[in-house]
Amino acid sequence: MSDDEQERTIAEDLVVTKYKMGGDIANQALRLVVEAAKPGVSVVSLCEKGDAYIMAETGKVFKKEKEMKKGIAFPTSVSVNNCVCHFSPLKSDPDYTLKDGDLVKIDLGVHVDGFIANVAHSFIVGVCKENPITGRKADVIKSAHLCAEAALRLVKPGNQNTQVTEAWNKIAQSFKCSPIEGMLSHQLKQHVIDGEKTIIQNPSDQQRKDHEKAEFEVHEVYAVDVLISTGEGKARDGGLRTTIYKRDPSKQYGLKMKTSRTFFSEVERRFDAMPFTLRTLESVE
């Protein structure tokens, strides 16, 4: 966005419509993936299912607007048990097959003209009325749910981001759980998934000192990420390679190799500044 271009917000009816369209598609994609997440189903197949649905459905809206960008704002990720988030493996990576009792976290995002709708859901495979969740898995899911409910009430004009952080800590502690240290929820803007204003979870002393306090304002949009653990809340490297990347529009670098330039132009054309998975580029030469 250029300096003389006015930022578009939900003060515009058309912007609200685009958010709603993205939200409807995101919720339908999430429902589709959750329903397909049965014992014996592979994580890769679920990720592919979610992404394919998003691309198909976003292709049906604003068809006359040929230049409008729309599609995946965050690749479908299926993170199981102690994997915190954003697990979206390549076809060539070791896959994981779901089984009864797995705690599954699904997250994905959709955008229409750069206006982003992110959704997520956590559940236990094989759970039903006759086979309810109990114990620590029940504690952590209930804690996360109440934290999300608290955020819905606290993220409003005039409140501070620190109020949300404090509420999450209190709720998690009441279930003997911990928010994952240092995880951020970001303000969303057109074509920007990681806006300047953030809400931090369970900050360390240094993070608390460094994190910028902010007040929520009218017409702002936020993606609220709630990540709760039955452990101490400190994420560790699981040894898996990164598969989700994002182009940084603020960085400029002259690529020397032809293959690098081809790859970069494909990323720019298809994803702009949205996160993408290498899985969708496995055929790029």
Per-segment meaning from a language model:
Residues M1-E285:
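Active-site neighborhoods and metal-handling regions in enzymes and metal-associated proteins
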